[in-house]
């Protein structure tokens, strides 16, 4: 009874057109297969830190050295090609993150998914990205080519998502489980095609059966999904501090305990 009442209150409050009419703030921490804004926050924090290149994944390559090989490389999320692989149609993290990325200039987004109507890019997200001026590409294998070269050699960020079998009917689940998903596995051979600075991301959890990213990849210095998980704590803590207007208090406490 309490659960039903709480859910009804949250629904009614979320549908108030004016935010100032809501008695308490509401955080969308993941809405089924629709959106996942807080994941997008931590993903963007990870991307911003990575493309600042002060703490690059390849610690033996400085930004200047990278530019000698990749002359068009710039700092920040702009001017980048982002690849999203896996369950694109139902991947809520994909929807939210690409929406944020669309705010940056000269962004290309590549979607790689099985040719199944529930897994491939939906018309709504495609339309949203096109309206934002984002160049969108769709492929059905990680071994595809872009600009006449292997696709994986052309991307600046790799974002994997698991196939979300919990959504859809039992018939759909059976169809997907019977598919050959090997073209969407990030194998060691495919990782070797990536540029040395490309962050490898995953929102977690991984599928231990399908193994879209096998554990053997975890030791690669470009892997960022463990850092993503850690960044989630900081991003969500920052969101709570912002919503409660506690930033000034936090800075005061920081100065008190850590200041000179």
Positions of predicted regions on the chain:
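Glycine-rich phosphate/diphosphate-binding loop of Rossmann-like nucleotide-binding domains
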Residues: 50-161
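Rossmann-like adenosine-cofactor binding region
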Residues: 130-216, 222
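Short, charged/polar "capping" segments at the starts of alpha-helices
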Residues: 2-8, 92, 116-122, 208-209
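Phosphate/diphosphate ligand-binding glycine-rich loop within oxidoreductases
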Residues: 1-54, 207, 213
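General beta-strand structural signal in soluble alpha/beta enzymes
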Residues: 25-29, 36, 84, 201, ...
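Adenosine-phosphate binding glycine-rich loop
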Residues: 194-260
């Amino acid at each position: 009874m309490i659960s039903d009442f709480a859910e009804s209150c949250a629904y009614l409050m979320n549908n108030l057109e004016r935010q100032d009419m809501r008695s308490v703030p509401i955080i969308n921490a993941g809405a089924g297969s629709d959106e996942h804004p807080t994941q997008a926050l931590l993903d963007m924090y990870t991307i911003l830190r990575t493309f600042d290149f002060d703490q690059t994944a390849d610690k033996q390559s400085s930004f200047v050295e990278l530019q000698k090989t990749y002359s068009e490389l710039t700092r920040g999320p702009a001017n980048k090609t982002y690849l999203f692989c896996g369950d694109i149609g139902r991947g809520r993290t994909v929807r939210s993150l690409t929406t944020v990325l669309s705010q940056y200039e000269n962004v290309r987004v590549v979607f790689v998914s099985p040719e199944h109507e529930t897994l491939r890019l939906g018309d709504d997200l495609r339309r949203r990205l096109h309206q934002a001026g984002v160049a969108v590409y769709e492929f059905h294998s990680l071994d595809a080519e872009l600009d006449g070269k292997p696709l994986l050699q052309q991307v600046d960020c790799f974002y994997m998502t698991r196939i979300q079998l919990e959504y859809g009917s039992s018939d759909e689940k059976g169809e997907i489980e019977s598919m050959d998903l090997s073209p969407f596995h990030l194998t060691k051979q495919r990782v070797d095609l990536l540029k040395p600075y490309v962050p490898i991301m995953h929102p977690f959890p991984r599928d231990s059966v399908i193994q879209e990213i096998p554990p053997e990849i975890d030791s690669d210095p470009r892997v960022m999904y463990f850092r993503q998980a850690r960044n989630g704590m900081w991003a969500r803590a920052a969101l709570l501090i912002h919503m409660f207007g506690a930033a000034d208090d936090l800075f005061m406490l920081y100065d008190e305990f850590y200041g000179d």
